[in-house]
């Protein structure tokens, strides 16, 4: 807790003036006022690196770097600066969480992982890119950090659950936690993307895998969208058959408006797309099976895939009864789930419904490269889930949270009551307003 208190104290001071000026050089030298060496301890290191904005990369940049004479030295020089910046930016926001949430064992564990990873990366800040042993050790460190952060999502989720069960959550805290988790998990996705790219390109393992031979790290330059959708459907179907002894069929159609008659392919991370469609299939299957439980006949899940000049769109339609409009936003709330929460020790088993994180995390995966995920529901009939992905790799640019004055203000501003009238539950008695 001592480190947590120190980091929190530094965060409460707010971001320094002028830290986000346009054209601020990513040069950790005298032009930034101080250097990591002059900062003492973890709080000083976090403060220093949080002064820099993360550098978002486009899918094309990821692709070009990995496919044209991939250079481990170049990756080393970029990551040893960029990873501390991304870690430090989100660590500042962790420190702004409510004290009681910071004290939960799960959040303390997550915080310790981030501190340890930052310190390990900073060991390489003065190493030469010409030092072969330093490059080798750095790749090992990247893989170790990636493995350390494997359970960040369920561990942070458990911390929030512990906090809610012990202290409850008022509307302001709930709003701040929702805001934080969106940014924290988006940061985690981006950090893992960098770690995966380096470890897959230079880690030495998996390079010869036939199924991934044409991949650039975790990116498939010719990702066959229908194949990923079918894979997600089959795996969700196995779970559905296990739970309900039956499952709805899949009706899949594609329309390539850009190149008629050709299969739809896009530069993308297949694991991200798989995560999204797998979660949507689980939700659609569960809703369909439960809504039609007494009928014994289960309508198929329809999926339409279209590729235009700007967007790749995947629309999944079910006849699972839908949800009321007032509940749509709740479906993207991290603490909302219509199914019982699994026990922590079984959270890795990927049940058909669980923490309630499937939809919000899936939306973050879509938004990570400037896409989106939206729900449109017809209560009593069914739901359409629509995934939007950028069709061009040059438009697919990382969406990254940055710790600045706007973010700091969000955590430290009291959110006033809504500025729209709240309707009463009972009709107003207009007789009291009759004129004499």
From Swiss-Prot:
Regulation of catalytic or functional activity: Activity is enhanced by binding to the pyruvate dehydrogenase subunit DLAT. Inhibited by AZD7545; this compound interferes with DLAT binding and thereby inhibits kinase activity. Inhibited by dichloroacetate and radicicol. Activated under hypoxic conditions by phosphoglycerate kinase PGK1-mediated phosphorylation at Thr-338.
Induction and repression of expression: Up-regulated via the HIF1A signaling pathway in response to hypoxia.
A Pfam family per the record: HATPase_c
Subcellular location: Mitochondrion matrix
Modified positions (Phosphothreonine) in chain numbering: 338
Location of the Histidine kinase domain: 163-393
Recorded GO CC terms: mitochondrial matrix; mitochondrion; pyruvate dehydrogenase complex
Protein name: [Pyruvate dehydrogenase (acetyl-transferring)] kinase isozyme 1, mitochondrial
